[in-house]
Amino acid sequence: MNSTEIMADLSSHTPMMQQYLKVKKDYQHALLFYRMGDFYELFFEDAHLAAKLLGITLTHRGKANGNPIPMAGVPYHSAEGYLARLVKAGRTVAICEQVGEVTGKGPVERKVVRILTPGTLTDDALLTSYQSSNLVALCIHQNQIGFALLDLSAGIFKVQQQDYKPEQLPIELARLMPSEILIDEDLVDPNIIEQIKKHLDCPVTKRPNVDFNLNNAQKTLCDQFSVSTLSGFGLDPLPLAKAAAAALIHYAKETQKTALPHIRSILLEQSTDFIALDPITRRNLEIIEPLFEHGTSLFQLVNDCQTAMGGRLLSRTLMQPVRDTALLDARLDAIEQLIQGYHESPVRLVLKEIGDIERVLSRVALGSARPRDLVQLRHACAQIPFLRNALAPVVQAKKSKLLGQLDQELGDFKSLHQHLMAAIVENPPVLLRDGNVIAEGYDAELDELRQIRDHAGQFLIDLEIKERERTGISTLKIGYNRVSGYYIELTRAQAEQAPADYIRRQTLKNAERYITPELKSFEDKVLSSESRALAREKALFEALLENLRENIAHLQMMSSAIAQIDVIANFAHQARLNNWARPEFTPETGIKIQGGRHPVVEALSKAPFTPNDTFLDVQHRMAIITGPNMGGKSTFMRQTALISLLAYCGSYVPARAAKLGPIDRIFTRIGSADDLSTGKSTFMVEMTETSQILHHATNQSLVLMDEVGRGTSTYDGLSLAWACVVDLTKRVKCLCLFATHYFELTELGSEPGIDNYHVTAQELNGNLILLHKVQQGPASQSHGLQVAKLAGIPANVIKEAQKRLRILEKQQQQHLQTSVQSDLFATLDSEVTPSIQVIEKVIEVEVSSPALDLLKQIEVDNLTPRQALEQLYELKAALNS
């Protein structure tokens, strides 16, 4: 039984359930949190789902069509934890609050006040400190695609439009790090959704076509920014980008139930502004998340930012390294100036005192800020003079234009700080409804209401004394009951002495009770003072928020400047702490790294890290790296990529020196496992990744390839690896580090553009010592058995392996003396099948073969024993063919 089935006949339900069903009708896509007193209740199918996802008790309330109505609930005061779990699970939640007064006639008025979705979160309780809530929209038309990103919690809004290439979609989306993706329900190819879900762990929400309407998009955005044209934003020739952006505005307003005053501008980006990193590369390099549960990512290592907004900016910076060397040098100049004068330490000490102002301002703009948010903002305003003072030596030296600019953007918020000091108590309660948020002395009316509320007894004592003196009646007394309210009581004998302003309220057997205008005024005030004081506080608090919204642009600029200063100071701190060097950029193709180190491995290793040099340029594009397992080949390749990545993020790098030419993309093919979800073998996964590289790498790409071809037979794998080296060197002309156990590939070291390197190792008394040093020339042997010995393989197994190795080496030597070398190891000038065709053929063969096709056709349940035997013979024949 669900709510949809019983909506046809509402008359059979209680008024409360009728109200619930009417609200639920408009929010079928969401879990409806329906406020009832101190609980949020869920009914029907929502109750079943919530009980399952949250582990809460499923009960019943009333009946529908003769059946008990399922119900589950969570306490109002602890709802945020439950909401966070539901949103993390990709669910949408509609919050339905009581907005009317309890009258005793029918259910209290309720309405949905906001909708929580994974891409529209702003509350700290629903987000981790370094987690962005990125809402992304796609608009595809013909051969073009528009992207738009909105982070409501940070006020970030940006777009781009480019040629639509399906294989590029995962790369762009990975850079944007979406929490939720909006698509047009009418226009999207189902394959797009499948591709998104394959590469990204985020929900895809289908939206009405009207939200993406190209004709309405211009007006939607102009209304949002209060402008008559979008020319100033550079969006005129980009209709799909505008449509995607407009869809985000519609969705955000619908979920927040309010305007978006903190979304004041929009940034136009180009994909060519950044170094492209596909999802595989991001994962293999462990940029944000480690490969294993207890591992350490690059972000986790280098993030010692003092503010949450600085940490989020650092995360975005690492995920989208920029190619503008002027911007990079500006960042590096700022880092250098902080390092030279030891200025990063005092800057970081001040930053540590600043809260998450970025999110506070978003909540202010959306009307969901709480009292302690304003305390955070007040404290941040107080820290600005100290931060500018810490930056002053660098700013005054005028050697970093970027820090000078950021110093100006910090602004001066002395008057705002004073206003907030006067308005908000030092330690307000968490929620405004608890009262006592507005400071004493800020508002005369509120002070009077509190005075009445808190000192009613004393007022009555004083009034009683005053009235006795005025009337001369010493037995006059003032009292109160719930029926009559406040009253002045006189005996019947004294009633004749009552002043003219005494108004008879009640007559008793032996007394008369009166009310005066003064007492009536007091009664009205005291009986409503609690609720009126709270209402007044709410009005004053909303006025404060409105005042802040009027200054939101300057406050957001201050917040952004703090985040940027934090990232720069963090990079300076890492450089000093870890002895990193400033990289140089050159327009000439190449990577030259002296004494490079892997930042994460070095930090976590107890032993001293062995630094290595990397040298690639137009004359030396390909480095074939051989040597034993555990020798450091993968570490060396990854450190080259991470050093390049950090440099293009504007950071110092873990090396003695580094000089880098242009890089448009970084590719990695390192390690694979079976993809059980798609039925792909390890080898198939490897070939698919390799195919992507061969199709999309350019002469400005950095490519890392590790053990290509190892998942198949020796000669198949060797042939594929050989063809890849040839193609990457001769056709693609990228910069490539190619690690392999196929020693035959070292024959290519004599060809133009290809060099051999090896990781060094020594045998001492039968034991292998790994030196982790990369040197020129091929490795002399693989040391595979010695590595197996180090891993604890039993001695008898090692001994048997040594015997077999000697036999195989002898056989291989005899075989190589015949025709293999002349056929397989042709020079680059020979006719070589392009490696892309080779890879695609392998993929085709794995996906479809005569034996596999025959096997698929067999109906196992219908075979007789004789037919089964015949089928086996056919399968064997197909395999042999």
Swiss-Prot record:
ATP binds at residues 627-634. Transmembrane segments: none annotated. GO terms for biological process: mismatch repair. Keywords: ATP-binding, DNA damage, DNA repair, DNA-binding, Nucleotide-binding. PANTHER family: DNA MISMATCH REPAIR PROTEIN MSH1, MITOCHONDRIAL, DNA MISMATCH REPAIR PROTEIN MUTS FAMILY MEMBER. HAMAP family: MutS. This is DNA mismatch repair protein MutS. It comes from Acinetobacter baumannii (strain SDF). The gene is mutS.
